[in-house]
Amino acid sequence: MKNVDHRNLDLFESVVDIARVSKVTKGGRQFSFRVAALVGDKKGCVGYATAKHDEVLDARSKAVRKAKGAMIRFPLREGRTIHHDCFSKLGASKLFIKPAPEGTGIVAGGAMRKFCEMLGVSDIIAKSYGSSTSGIVIRNAIKAFSLVCSPEYVAGKRNRKKSKFISKAVTQ
C-alpha cells in the first residue's frame, strides 16, 4: 500500500458527504462545512480525505487536494474485480467483499458503490454490516482492499510459482 504520484494520472472526483458542523464557543456557535471526497483514476488508484472550511466550495477543494495526496494503488484482477474474498472490521463497521463474474456489476450500496466506481472495479459483491456512516465505510473499504493480495505477490513472498495459488476455476 504505497502512495501514488497523482500528477500524471487522469483523475475523477466525487463528493461522498457534505455536513454542516458547529463549534460551540463562549460567543455562540460557529458553523462550518465538512466535506468527504474521493479521487480515483478508475484503473486501481483511489484516494479519500475529509476537510472543513467556512464555505462548501473551499471545503470541497481542500478535501480533493488532500485526497490526491493520499492516493493508494490496489491490485485488481483483469482490471475489473478483486483476487479473493476479504472481511474487514473497523470500529463498528464490518465489510465483506467478494469477486464477481464478468457482467455482474457493482452489488454494493451507498458509499461503497462510489468507492468501487472511483477505484475502477466493475464486478464485485460487497456487504456492509454495522455502522453505515459513509466515512467509516470508505475507511473500512480501504482497509479491506489493502488486505487483498495478487497471486504474483503471494508467490513472490513464498518463493513459489504463481500457478500454485490459482485454482482451476479461475484460470478457465
UniProtKB/Swiss-Prot annotation:
Secretion signal span: none
GO biological process terms held by the UniProt record: translation
Keywords: Ribonucleoprotein, Ribosomal protein, RNA-binding, rRNA-binding
GO cellular component: small ribosomal subunit
Coiled-coil region: none
RNA-binding in keyword set: yes
UniProt cross-references to InterPro entries, sorted A to Z: Ribosomal_Su5_D2-typ_SF, Ribosomal_uS5, Ribosomal_uS5_bac-type, Ribosomal_uS5_C, Ribosomal_uS5_N, Ribosomal_uS5_N_CS, Ribsml_uS5_D2-typ_fold_subgr
Keyword Kinase: no
Domain S5 DRBM: 11-74
Domain of life: Bacteria
Example GO molecular function: structural constituent of ribosome
Family designation: Belongs to the universal ribosomal protein uS5 family.
Domain notes: The N-terminal domain interacts with the head of the 30S subunit; the C-terminal domain interacts with the body and contacts protein S4. The interaction surface between S4 and S5 is involved in control of translational fidelity.
Subunit structure: Part of the 30S ribosomal subunit. Contacts proteins S4 and S8.
Function noted in UniProt: With S4 and S12 plays an important role in translational accuracy. Located at the back of the 30S subunit body where it stabilizes the conformation of the head with respect to the body.
Name of the protein in its database record: Small ribosomal subunit protein uS5
Organism expressing this protein natively: Neorickettsia sennetsu (strain ATCC VR-367 / Miyayama)
Lineage, broadest ranks: Bacteria, Pseudomonadati, Pseudomonadota, Alphaproteobacteria, Rickettsiales
